[in-house]
């Protein structure tokens, strides 16, 4: 059995769950289409805690996503495939999507780059974001818009980019300088009695 056949078989196994357990399709649809807004809201909440640790985490997370997305575009130019619903018969398709290159999965890149970066900062609670990232990845296959390989590649890019940024960004002093300047201006405009720059504080 070829790797391509394994990829298709794995897709069929997950996607066919939508036919067997159709009552879960609305939940899967929500995960696949709208959970990104929950992720964005989570980053806003972390930012509004006004701790330097959380704000650096948000900045690093955004950088990790940008790095992963750039790498994803490069990978997509080297290998491409259309969505399963465009190439396979009898696909459980939950999402209306234009036919284009589905490799790698942008949604998975987004959730794993940011989710894993959060995990690196907050290991006690960050695993929840990884569970969410995994759920979103599965939902994209279940919905018929990605193959397992698309999702796996996106997850790998996201994790590697998060690790790269987590290890290298602290050495970029201008990030800390810009954040410090922002916080000084913010403190003048919107004073916070409990403002703390304690990087060990968890949210």
Curated annotation (Swiss-Prot):
Q: Which GO terms describe its molecular function?
A: undecaprenyl-diphosphatase activity
Organism (species): Bacillus licheniformis
**Could you tell me the superkingdom of the organism this chain comes from?**
Bacteria
Q: Which CDD domains match?
A: PAP2_BcrC_like
SUPFAM superfamilies per record: Acid phosphatase/Vanadium-dependent haloperoxidase
Lineage, highest ranks first: Bacteria, Bacillati, Bacillota, Bacilli, Bacillales
For this UniProt record, give its keywords in alphabetical order, as a comma-separated list.
Antibiotic resistance, Cell membrane, Membrane, Transmembrane, Transmembrane helix, Transport
A GO cellular component annotated for this chain's UniProt record is: plasma membrane
Principal localization reads membrane
Q: What does this protein do?
A: Part of the binding-protein-dependent transport system for bacitracin that confer resistance to this antibiotic; probably responsible for the translocation of the substrate across the membrane.
Q: What's the name of its gene?
A: bcrC
Q: What is the protein named?
A: Bacitracin transport permease protein BcrC
Q: InterPro entries of this UniProt entry?
A: P_Acid_Pase_2/haloperoxi_sf, P_Acid_Pase_2/haloperoxidase, UPP_Pase
């Amino acid at each position: 059995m070829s790797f391509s056949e394994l990829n298709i078989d794995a897709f069929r196994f997950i996607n066919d769950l939508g036919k067997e357990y159709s009552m879960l399709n609305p939940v899967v649809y929500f995960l696949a289409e709208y959970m990104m807004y929950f992720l964005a809201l989570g980053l806003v909440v972390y930012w509004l805690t006004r701790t330097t640790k959380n704000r650096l985490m948000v900045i690093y997370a955004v950088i990790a996503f940008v790095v992963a997305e750039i790498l994803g575009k490069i990978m997509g130019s080297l290998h491409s495939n259309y969505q399963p619903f465009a190439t396979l018969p009898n696909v459980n398709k939950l999402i209306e999507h234009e036919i284009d290159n589905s490799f790698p999965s942008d949604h998975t890149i987004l959730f794993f780059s940011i989710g894993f970066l959060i995990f690196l900062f907050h290991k006690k609670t960050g695993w929840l974001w990884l569970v969410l990232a995994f759920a979103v990845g599965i939902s994209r296959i279940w919905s018929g818009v990605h193959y397992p390989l698309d999702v796996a590649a996106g997850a790998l890019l996201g994790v590697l980019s998060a690790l790269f940024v987590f290890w290298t960004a602290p050495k970029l002093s201008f990030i800390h300088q810009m954040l410090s300047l922002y916080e000084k201006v913010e403190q003048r405009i919107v004073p916070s009695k409990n403002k703390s720059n304690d990087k060990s504080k968890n949210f």
